């Protein structure tokens, strides 16, 4: 019977599909893969219902592969747990593999796996425990971490290195899910740093380095152990981790950096591993940044790092080149001159085929700019922009050009005419750029901040408004028209020909609504400027002609589909019509007394003057934080609706397409007579001259549009001449350009900015020539003197021609502040935040400082009892009591600060001393001498009562009797008699007892220190008997 059952299972399994068959079937059914997989899933469900664990294991293996293809297998969670609990290792391994892919920390089925995983962790077979640790690391939850933390910590002490290594690595995941486990597990984790197995040691280093990545200050006392590992280990990957850790610890303790410079420099010289070299350079940079003020002779280390980074950048490997540029940018922040010497190499990286290399080189150029080389660098970038392929990289180049020039409030721009020319060139080069708004902001900012350059700016903006090509590509670049129109209107007094600029703004164009609105607004400014000129010249006919011309041109803005443009145009028309009506009466009343000498009515003059007052005054930039600093009035709720929105049902029932059309038509055709429907009817019946004018405008616009297919030229030249009678009115830059024309145009544009560069180079050359001439005269007199070059780079930089106004507009009574809300700086969901735990590393701590300070404070409190007896009246006693209370508070605070500082130095000082010693352990004689010279007591684990005998306490107890005697002496003078003598005798007895107890404690401390030091000879760790060394050793 049993044989028949075995045969049946064998024949059934012979036709089962294994994982190989599944993969082969999926490859053969590429056209209907989903259908084939659904069939396989049904077969797998049938296999999971069988009792044979091998069949279930095969089914789970196939489910694991199907899950990798993106299919959900969460429905098989119970079957996966069943396979995980198998006693066979092959099945258990497949089960844990499926669980690591299917389960996650929030899975509800994990509560069923706690006892099973604990059983595997405590198994005698190391591979069962190993596979359990590997799988658990993928789906461990806070509950599993809490329940299994002790079992995993037990494995850290296993006799098998395989399990110790996995347990150490697993503890990091436990710490993230259950931070409370860090404190009890840390002593064992620290022991593994000196484990004889290199794999376990490397795992412990990895875990501590990951823990210290976010909270490095908690692991500063472990620096001696890591220093020993760094100088003795040959494992490059472990060295990289240790060096990264030192890079995080150095800013917290700059003295540590001075000890690291020499070994790191040796590693840089000796290592051939590029990864280790890069980490060494990174750490040296961090060290030099933290100790730059205390280590003047570090230029050699910087030069070494820069030379090694140049080797990385010149390497053919793109990854090394990128890392070299990245590290070079870190050096640039603190030592820019060292990096500027390699400017040619950085500029050469702009031609690299890898875009990430080019972008990293652009970031470096931002910090290499000076007043002397700004124009040259911008010229190189403009040349790269012409040759660059891809709109994204061209946009990044444009952004970097503006960022380089505008940094630190235009610190390096010496000629703003050159900068405005560059901005105009960027507009013409990058018609389809997405940075049009950025260029517009720069144009506005320069025109507002630099008053001297405004005349040049308005002329450039007039040309830009006249020659800007409207195309489908320039959606974002339309914003420059916004800036140009605002500049010519705001600073209309700087215009050479305001009437020409007014005609340019009134020219009909297909522009976005907000651009048309700015056009209308600045037309009013220019009109007010020209009207004021007519008043000054007493030119009545010119003023009438101006009003008629502007009223006629503003009519096409009245028909705009943008409601803002309509409102502004109608308001402008009404205002100008009022002025026109007043001027029309002046011709009939020329002989009356109500007119002035030139015939302009006084009311018309008042209208022009009031219109001019609307735009008087100078605008300054608004501070970025101005709006948030405006106080809200009481009772104002910014979230409340001004007008409550109508209900959705009412809005849907009352609105329809027909109603929308009626509203739109009534808005455009409302009114009759001279201003209403009559003009609308006239626009529908165009004269032949108007039709011809519109046709010519349409042909010119089509010729300017590069996306419009032009008609082929005909053989008849006369017809072309007739067709383009107004050819002289077409601006040259709006002509359709082929590739050769574009190249020629770009060359001509680039020469405009090159003119300023040539002038700067010529001026710099003349200065250099004068310096050489003076130096040649002085060289004959100073033959025997030491040469000293007093000229610095800043002296050779050109002086700025213009002054930038940095005043910002703020609300009244509000001042600028740099305080920012930093609540969003750190992620509240970061698990490392919970791991910021102060660990009890007793090897370097001084726990007795706080208790000593408390006791000394209590002693000093006792000293005040004699003083309370002094004084004649209640008022004097109260005053003295208040003064003494204040003194007591100040002393307690001072002692608390001193104890806190001494405790911190006690934790850090052994780190530096042990690293500086270069020996595993100090000699017993040295230990004894140190403890005796510093008058410190030892810290023994079996004698906790001595923990409070520290230097701070002894100093307090030594000084307290003297202070007490002084205070008592003064009290004796005041009190006098028997009461004073009793107080003095008590003080002398107390002082004698304290001195006797201190001598006994010092003797015991020196003996225990010698014994503990002798016991711990040969270990690198500092013995427990060693007290904190004094600062004099350092």
From Swiss-Prot:
Residue ranges with Polar residues bias: 1025-1034
Gene from which the chain derives: g
One of the record's GO cellular component terms: axon cytoplasm
Keyword Phosphoprotein: yes
Biased composition, class Low complexity, residue ranges: 928-942, 1007-1016
Name of this protein: AP-3 complex subunit delta
Basic and acidic residues: compositionally biased ranges: 822-836, 882-906
Compartments where found: Cytoplasmic vesicle, Clathrin-coated vesicle membrane; Golgi apparatus
